[in-house]
């Protein structure tokens, strides 16, 4: 009951296959240079973009650029991802925070003059100056004042009365002497 040569050869081949798989898993990563490095960075980083040197927050004294890291030394996925740019998030980007409204939600108008399309941005309000309804109110007030002024001019007396009292000038009128 000894081990035959065929069984020992089978065991040796199985061991070599297992050893080669383990070595392939733990071997150093490959090096990337030039166009291959750029293509790999574009694939890994996608729309975020990438840096050839790390951002200033990650710099230490012995920091190297990605070319020195990946072309002359080994390079792996984790190292490549450290050179990806952070996605720029706009302050007005609200796509991440979606508000779910109930199905029975109805929007009621706030007021006649404060519709959302007329009051979009403060810069537009400043460019427009006074809102139309305030200009109309001011115009109505000015129109009333002008009408009152015209009415006062149209109702002038037919005879112009003296502005000063005749008694103060020293002249006596005939009515004052007969009393």
UniProtKB/Swiss-Prot annotation:
Name its GO BP terms in alphabetical order. Answer: embryonic placenta development; embryonic placenta morphogenesis; glucose metabolic process; in utero embryonic development; negative regulation of muscle cell differentiation; negative regulation of transcription by RNA polymerase II; ossification; positive regulation of activated T cell proliferation
**Which residues does the annotated region (B) include?**
25-52
| Alphabetized GO MF terms | growth factor activity; hormone activity; insulin-like growth factor receptor binding; integrin binding; protein serine/threonine kinase activator activity
Q: Please report any disulfide bonds recorded for this protein chain, giving both cysteine positions.
A: 33-71, 45-84, 70-75
> Where is region (C) located?
53-64
Q: How is it modified after translation?
A: Proteolytically processed by PCSK4, proIGF2 is cleaved at Arg-128 and Arg-92 to generate big-IGF2 and mature IGF2.
Q: Which positions are glycosylated?
A: 106, 154, 163
Q: Where is this site: Important for interaction with integrin?
A: 48, 58, 61-62
Which SMART domains does the record associate with it? Answer: IlGF
Q: Which residues form the propeptide?
A: 92-179
Region entry Disordered, spans = 160-179
Q: What job does this protein perform?
A: The insulin-like growth factors possess growth-promoting activity. Major fetal growth hormone in mammals. Plays a key role in regulating fetoplacental development. IGF2 is influenced by placental lactogen. Also involved in tissue differentiation. In adults, involved in glucose metabolism in adipose tissue, skeletal muscle and liver. Acts as a ligand for integrin which is required for IGF2 signaling. Positively regulates myogenic transcription factor MYOD1 function by facilitating the recruitment of transcriptional coactivators, thereby controlling muscle terminal differentiation.
Name of the protein this chain belongs to: Insulin-like growth factor 2
Q: What's the source species for this entry? A: Ovis aries (Sheep)
């Amino acid at each position: 009951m000894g081990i035959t040569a065929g069984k020992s050869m089978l065991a040796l081949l199985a061991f070599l296959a297992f050893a080669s798989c383990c070595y392939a898993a733990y071997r150093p990563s490959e090096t990337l240079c030039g166009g291959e490095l750029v293509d790999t960075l574009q694939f890994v980083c996608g729309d975020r973009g990438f840096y050839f040197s790390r951002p200033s927050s990650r710099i230490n004294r012995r920091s190297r650029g990605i070319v020195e890291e990946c072309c002359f030394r080994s390079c792996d996925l984790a190292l490549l991802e450290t050179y990806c740019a952070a996605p720029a998030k706009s302050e007005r980007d609200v796509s991440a925070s979606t508000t779910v409204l109930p199905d029975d939600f109805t929007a009621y108008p706030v007021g006649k003059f404060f519709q959302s399309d007329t009051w979009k941005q403060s810069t537009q309000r400043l460019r427009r100056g006074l809102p139309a309804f305030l200009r109309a109110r001011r115009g109505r007030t000015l129109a009333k004042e002008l009408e009152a002024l015209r009415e006062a001019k149209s109702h002038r007396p037919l005879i112009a009365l003296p502005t000063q009292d005749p008694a103060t000038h020293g002249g006596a009128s005939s009515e004052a002497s007969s009393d």
